[in-house]
C-alpha cells in the first residue's frame, strides 16, 4: 500500500463527507470514506496526527477536484466559489468494486483447489503455486479490508472448497500478523507458501468433512493426525526448496514451543507458530457441516491468548491484524442498531460499522456509516450471523471504506 501524506488543512468542512479513507503512517484505517467528521473532539484528534491516504485514492480525488473547479470556471463563478468547489464524495462507478473483489477471490480459490489436488514433481506445480501466491498477495495489498470482509463473511456461511478457501484466509491473517511483527520479506514469503500448502495431503478430505454432518471415522482421524508430516513430505518430493516453508508445514500443529520467546526460536519454528495461530482462528470462525461457525471474539480467545490467558507476542499481533470485530462480522451498537463491520479501526475494538437495522428493528434503505469511537455507536456485542435476516448490497456497504476508485477485477493468471 503506497501512502500519500495529507495536510490537516485539506480536510473537508464539517458538513462534508470524507472523499477517501484517512489512514495513519502504518496504513491502519482511522476514518472511512463517506463519514462526516462532525465530532469536534474527533476532528481535533485527527488534526494532531500525521494523516495519510492511499496514493491512488488521493490522485483520483485531485483529478475530480480539478474537474469540479474547471466546471465552476466555465460557468463564470467568482474566484472564491471556484476555490470552494468540491466533487461528490464518491463516484457512481464504485458499485462494481466489491463484486470484483469477491469474484477475484473465488477465481483464486478455484485455481488453488486445482493446484492442491495436483501436487507432484513432474509438472509445473511449483510455478503455478508461486504465481498464485503472487496474485493473492497483490490482491490483499490492494484491497485489504474488502478481502478480510470477504473471507469472514463467506467463512460463516459456506463450506464449498473449504480447503482452498481456508488456505487463502490463513495466508491473509498470517502475512498481516507477520508484517506487524516486523519480519523480513523472505520469512513472510515462506509463511505465505506454507499457509497455502499446509493441508495439501488432506485437501479432498477437508472438503468432504466440511460438507457432512457426521464426525470423522477412525481412519479419517488417523489421516488428519498425520497430515502435517505427510504434507511436508509431498512438498519436498515436489521440489519445493524453501526449507523454512517445508519445515513450518511439518511443525504447524506442534504446540510445544508455545510460551517461549519468539526471537529465541528458529525461523521455521517462528513461521510454524504464526501459521498455527492463524490456522486456528480461521478454522474456528468457519462453518462446517457438523457445527456452526464460532464468533470472531470467541475464536480470538483460542487463537490469540498465550498459556497465561493473556495475548502473547503472536496473539497481540494477530489481534491487531484482524481486530476483535473483523470486517464481515455483525455487531450490535450502543445505539441498539445492528450492523456489519466494514473495516478495521485504529484499535481492535473500534471498527468502522455500516448500520443496517435501527434500534426498533426497521431496516435502513441505505447502510449508515457509524464511527465506533463515538460512544453513542460503540460496539456493544458481536451478533451471530444467523440472527441477521436483512438483505443488503455489499458494494454499498464496502463503499463506506473503499474510497472513490473503482478498481478493475483481477485479470486471469498468467496474463501479466
Residue ranges with predicted function:
Residues 1-128, 378, 383-416:
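Membrane-cytosol interface segments
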Residues 36-40, 337-382:
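Low-complexity, glycine/alanine/valine/leucine- and proline-rich hydrophobic stretches
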Residues 38, 184, 241-242, 295:
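Helix N-cap / loop-to-helix initiation motif
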Residues 50-64, 290, 345-346, 354-366:
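Short, solvent-exposed cationic patches
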Residues 80-225, 236-239:
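Acidic/His-rich, divalent-metal-binding segments that scaffold phosphate/diphosphate chemistry
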Residues 188-215, 231, 246-260, 275-282, ...:
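His-Asp-centered metal-binding catalytic motifs of divalent-metal-dependent phosphohydrolases/nucleases
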Residues 195, 235-276, 290-291, 302-348:
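Histidine/acidic-rich helix-loop-helix segments that form or flank divalent-metal centers
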Residues 224-228, 268-286, 293-302:
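Active-site-proximal alpha-helical segments within enzyme catalytic domains
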Amino acid at each position: 500500500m503506497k501512502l500519500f501524506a495529507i495536510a490537516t488543512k485539506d480536510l473537508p468542512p464539517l458538513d462534508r463527507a470524507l472523499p477517501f479513507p484517512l489512514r495513519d503512517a502504518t496504513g491502519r484505517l482511522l476514518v472511512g470514506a463517506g463519514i462526516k467528521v462532525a465530532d469536534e473532539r474527533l476532528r481535533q484528534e485527527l488534526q494532531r496526527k500525521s494523516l495519510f491516504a492511499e496514493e491512488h485514492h488521493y490522485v483520483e480525488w485531485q483529478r475530480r477536484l480539478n474537474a469540479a473547479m474547471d466546471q465552476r470556471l466555465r460557468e463564470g463563478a467568482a474566484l472564491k466559489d471556484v476555490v470552494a468547489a468540491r466533487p461528490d464524495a464518491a463516484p457512481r462507478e464504485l458499485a462494481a468494486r466489491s463484486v470484483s473483489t469477491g469474484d477475484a477471490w473465488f477465481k483464486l480459490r478455484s485455481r488453488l483447489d486445482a493446484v492442491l489436488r495436483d501436487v507432484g514433481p513432474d509438472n509445473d506445480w511449483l510455478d503455478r503455486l508461486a504465481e498464485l501466491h503472487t496474485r493473492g498477495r497483490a490482491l490483499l495489498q490492494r484491497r485489504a479490508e474488502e478481502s478480510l470482509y470477504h473471507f469472514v463473511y463467506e467463512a460463516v456461511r459456506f463450506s464449498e472448497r473449504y480447503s482452498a478457501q481456508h488456505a487463502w484466509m490463513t495466508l491473509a491473517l498470517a502475512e498481516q500478523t507477520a508484517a506487524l511483527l516486523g519480519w523480513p520479506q523472505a520469512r513472510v514469503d515462506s509463511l505465505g507458501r506454507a499457509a497455502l500448502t499446509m493441508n495439501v495431503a488432506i485437501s479432498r478430505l477437508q472438503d468432504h468433512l466440511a460438507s457432512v454432518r457426521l464426525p470423522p471415522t477412525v481412519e479419517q482421524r488417523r489421516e488428519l493426525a498425520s497430515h502435517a508430516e505427510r504434507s511436508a513430505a509431498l512438498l519436498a518430493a515436489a521440489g519445493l526448496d524453501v526449507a523454512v516453508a517445508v519445515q513450518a508445514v511439518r511443525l504447524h500443529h506442534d504446540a510445544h514451543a508455545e510460551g517461549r520467546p519468539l526471537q529465541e526460536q528458529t525461523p521455521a519454528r517462528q513461521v510454524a507458530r504464526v501459521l498455527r495461530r492463524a490456522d486456528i482462528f480461521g478454522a474456528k470462525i468457519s462453518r462446517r457441516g457438523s457445527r456452526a461457525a464460532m464468533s470472531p471474539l470467541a475464536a480470538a480467545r483460542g487463537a490469540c491468548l498465550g498459556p497465561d490467558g493473556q495475548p502473547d507476542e503472536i496473539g497481540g499481533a494477530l489481534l491487531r491484524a484482524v481486530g476483535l470485530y473483523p470486517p464481515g462480522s455483525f455487531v450490535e451498537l450502543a445505539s441498539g442498531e445492528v450492523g456489519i463491520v466494514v473495516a478495521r479501526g485504529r484499535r481492535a475494538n473500534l471498527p468502522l460499522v455500516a448500520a443496517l437495522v435501527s434500534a426498533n428493528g426497521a431496516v435502513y434503505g441505505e447502510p449508515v456509516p457509524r464511527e465506533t469511537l463515538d460512544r453513542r455507536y460503540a460496539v456493544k456485542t458481536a451478533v451471530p450471523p444467523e440472527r441477521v435476516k436483512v438483505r443488503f448490497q455489499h458494494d454499498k456497504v464496502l463503499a463506506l471504506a473503499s474510497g472513490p476508485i473503482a478498481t478493475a477485477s483481477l485479470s486471469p493468471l498468467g496474463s501479466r
